C-alpha cells in the first residue's frame, strides 16, 4: 500500500531533476526557481522512500533464501533487523507525507491583548510578550514591536509585534487563544490568588498577492494621537484607523509620528487579520487543526493556564501539564510546550490520512 503511494513522488522528483538540466528551464529563471523549490520540498521524502523500497526488496530477496541450508539462518537474522528498519522508515515517511502547512515558513504578527482581570491581565501581557521575545532569541528570530499600548502599572493593554525568521509560524501558530493566569498580584496584601485572562492571536504575514483588497472597501479615518491620560503626543492628524467595510475589521495605528507610516503599518496588519479570518473559515474543514486552534482566530477558547502558586503550566487542548512554569517564562524555552503539541497534531493528521 505504502509502496504505491511513494512511487509518484519518486517519479516526480526524477522528472524535476531531468527538467532542471534542460536549456528550456535554465533560461527561464521563474520556472527554474519554482522547480527547485518543489525539488527541495520533495527531497527528504524521496530519500526515505528510496531507502524504504530498497529495504523492502532486501527483505523479499532474503525470504527466497529461507529454505537454503547454508544461508537460511543468516537471511532470517538479517531480516529481523531489516523489518525493524522498515517499521522505523514507515513511521518517518508517514510524518513526511503529512501535507505541509503553506504558512509554516511565514513571518507572523503576534497580537497580545489584556482581557478580564484589570491591571494584572495587563502585567501578564508584558510577561508573556517578554517570554516570547526570549523564545525568539533562542531561535534566532527578530522581533519588531509594531504597536503597543501601555497601562498605568507597567503592563500593556495590547502589544502587536512582527516576528521574522525561519519557521516562525510553524512553532507559534499553536499559541492563538485565551491564556489564563492565576497568581498573587504584587499589590495584593492578603495573599489572595487572582485569576485573569489575556488573548493571543498569531497571524501570518501576507503579501499583496495573497490578500487583494479593493481600495473602495476601505474607510480611512485620521485623528490626533493621544498619549497617556489623554495628553496629545502629536499636534497633527497622524493617527490612522482603517476599516474594512465588508467585514467590519478595523485597525488603529498611532505609534509613528508620520501618518503615512501609520497607514502603512495599519494596512499590513489589516491584511494579516483578513487572511486570518480566511484561515478560520477553512479551519472547519480540518478537524485535527480545529482541535488545536491552529491558525484559528477564535480567541474565546481557553487553551492554557499559568498557575504560579503551583509552578504549573497546563495546555488544555492536549492535557499537557508541566511543573516548570517559572523556568519556561524566564528562559523562554517554549519548545517543551510546543514539541508535545506538534507531536499530538501530527498524530491526529496521520490518523485522519489513514481513515
UniProtKB/Swiss-Prot annotation:
Gene3D superfamilies: 3.30.160.20, 3.30.70.1660, 6.10.140.1950
Keywords in alphabetical order: Cytoplasm, Methylation, Protein biosynthesis
SMART domains reported in the protein's UniProt record: PCRF (SM00937)
Post-translational modification: Methylated by PrmC. Methylation increases the termination efficiency of RF1.
Compartments in which it is found: Cytoplasm
List of residues that carry N5-methylglutamine: 231
Gene Ontology cellular-component annotations: cytoplasm
Molecular function in Gene Ontology: translation release factor activity, codon specific
Domain of life of the source: Bacteria
Location (main, coarse): cytoplasm
Similarity comment text for this entry: Belongs to the prokaryotic/mitochondrial release factor family.
Record's function text: Peptide chain release factor 1 directs the termination of translation in response to the peptide chain termination codons UAG and UAA.
The protein's name in its UniProt record: Peptide chain release factor 1
